[in-house]
């Protein structure tokens, strides 16, 4: 029963993000959390505050306004106070230049009592970097901007 509830919530969160709405993700974060995106590029890095994470999603939507996720598998394990969710997905977008790309990846999410304490986004970084470089060549300065990162909570020090 719990797994079915978590699965429905995960599917709904990805649907919201695919519709340009990161609010449900932000509202689902625990008071202390880490939001991580693999790679050394404009979308990479770790965020530990709602403000930095909100700014990150705003950047994501500016760079990839029609980003969409096709969920291929959702795996859930663990008790309610320490739930691990792994989501295998295929992301598609047209960037701001209209070139359609597809990038596979995985989200790893940790939940404690229904709140997200960790969101790890692990895409095919070659695809992400290629898209960002292409956007930069098309004149999108934000594609090569510094990472949006936040301060570490004492929990992570």
Q: Where is each model-derived feature located?
A:
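Short, low-complexity N-terminal intrinsically disordered segments enriched in polar/charged residues
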Residues: 1-31, 138-157
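Residue-level recognition of short loop/turn positions
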Residues: 32, 97, 113-115
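Acidic surface patches and DE-rich sequence motifs
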Residues: 37, 95, 111
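A solvent-exposed, acidic/Ser-Thr-rich amphipathic alpha-helical stretch
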Residues: 23-24, 30-83
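Generic short beta-strand segments
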Residues: 34, 88-94
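Short beta-strand edge/turn micro-motifs at domain boundaries
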Residues: 104-133
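Short, surface-exposed coil-to-beta transition loops
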Residues: 69, 100-107
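Structural motif
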Residues: 82-86, 104-106
């Amino acid at each position: 029963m719990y797994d079915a509830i978590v699965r429905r919530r995960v599917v709904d969160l990805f649907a919201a993000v695919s519709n340009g709405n990161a609010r449900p993700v932000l509202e689902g974060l625990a008071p202390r959390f880490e939001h991580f995106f693999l790679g050394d590029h404009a979308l990479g890095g770790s965020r530990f505050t709602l403000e930095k994470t909100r700014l990150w999603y705003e950047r994501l939507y500016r760079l990839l306004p029609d980003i969409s996720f096709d969920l291929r598998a959702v795996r859930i394990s663990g008790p309610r106070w320490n739930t691990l969710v792994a989501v295998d997905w295929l992301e598609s977008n047209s960037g701001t230049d209209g070139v359609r790309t597809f990038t596979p990846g995985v989200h790893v999410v940790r939940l404690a009592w229904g709140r997200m304490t960790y969101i790890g986004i692990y895409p095919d970084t070659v695809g992400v970097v290629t898209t960002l470089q292409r956007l930069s060549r098309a004149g999108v300065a934000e594609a090569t901007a510094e990472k949006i990162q936040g301060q570490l909570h004492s929990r992570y020090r």
